[in-house]
Amino acid sequence: MQDNSSHSRESASAGDDPLGIDKLTVDYDYLLYKIRDYVQSIQLDTTELCKKQNEVMVNGIIENTIDKNIAKFKELLEKCDTLENHYEMLNQLAIITDTFKERIAEAVNNYNSLKKGASKSK
């Protein structure tokens, strides 16, 4: 048997946010967290690679490590591409939010027009 009070709370919660703004806020915060994490990861990888490259140059151990360094730099570039994709997601969110009010107003106007048309035909 299901507890009716918990079911009504769940229904009320879903009804409180029919447009999913709370979920969008959480998703936006998570995206910012992922971007921050990627930036920190790239920073650490870059610092490590630069230190290793400096050691290679100082110690003259170039032959065996060039391929490893190239592979690590490729990984770093892939992370940069992923970061760029996250920023593109943010740009898309900005575009959506910039036009949100206009789209809502247009939807309300369309609804009102349909409502007036339906009442005239009665």
From Swiss-Prot:
User: InterPro entries recorded for this chain?
Assistant: CNL1
Q: Write down any Gene Ontology CC term.
A: cytoplasm
Q: Where is the composition biased (Basic and acidic residues)?
A: 1-10
- Tell me the CDD domains matching this sequence: BLOC1_CNL1
Q: Which domain of life is it from?
A: Eukaryota
Q: Which residues form a coiled coil?
A: 63-95
Question: Record keywords: Lipid biosynthesis included?
Answer: no
- For this entry, list what GO says about its biological process: endosome organization
Reported function: Component of the biogenesis of lysosome-related organelles complex-1 (BLOC-1), a complex that is involved in endosomal cargo sorting.
Query: What family classification does the UniProt entry report for this protein?
Result: Belongs to the BLOC1S4 family.
Q: What is this protein called?
A: Biogenesis of lysosome-related organelles complex 1 subunit CNL1
Organism of this sequence = Saccharomyces cerevisiae (strain YJM789)
| UniProt gene name | CLN1
